[in-house]
Amino acid sequence: KELLSKMTLEEKIGQMLCFAFHGTEYNEQLKILIEDHHIGTIIHFARNIENLDQIYKLNKAIHEKSKYPMFIGLDHEGGMVRRVMEDITYLPGAMALSNATDEELYKIYNQTGKELKILGFNMNYMPSVDVNNNPYNPVINSRSYSDEPNMVSKRGGIAAVAMQDALVLP
């Protein structure tokens, strides 16, 4: 409440916005978004991530240059949707994890969350809680835990709690 009371209207509006950008280092585009428009969230895509050292430095610069705490996110749900590809625990897709115990599922998502947090991320656009109601759908298929809504809900809940416990917002 105290922080909000000190913000201008422009800063409050900026905090509600999420932007992607081009590049792999802190550049003029990011400067304008963060320092001039005070946006609240940056999302990284594969085009922004080269290696662990680079993404750590980029995220550190984003956090340091922002006047207000930033959300820095990525889409790292596992399987074919992974943005950090090297030197991080491999996270299989949801279907591949469908036979894991609840404890195993929690551990792998929590470990992934801890690794993302070390790299400067505090938001992960996951889990996918799509129900695989059409096995021929090429977009959902292996990204779903099951064709049973209750199972998808339970597994997605475990993944979300594991990320939250690693201080990464799902």
Features from the language model and the residues they span:
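Boundary/entry segment of secreted carbohydrate-active catalytic domains
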Residues: 1-25
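Extracellular/periplasmic catalytic domains that process cell-envelope and extracellular macromolecules
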Residues: 9-13, 34-36, 65-66, 164-165
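Flexible loop/turn segments at secondary-structure boundaries
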Residues: 25-26, 132
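Short acidic active-site motifs
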Residues: 28-30
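Enzymes and membrane/adaptor proteins characterized by extended Gly/Ser/Thr/Asp/Glu-rich
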Residues: 33-155
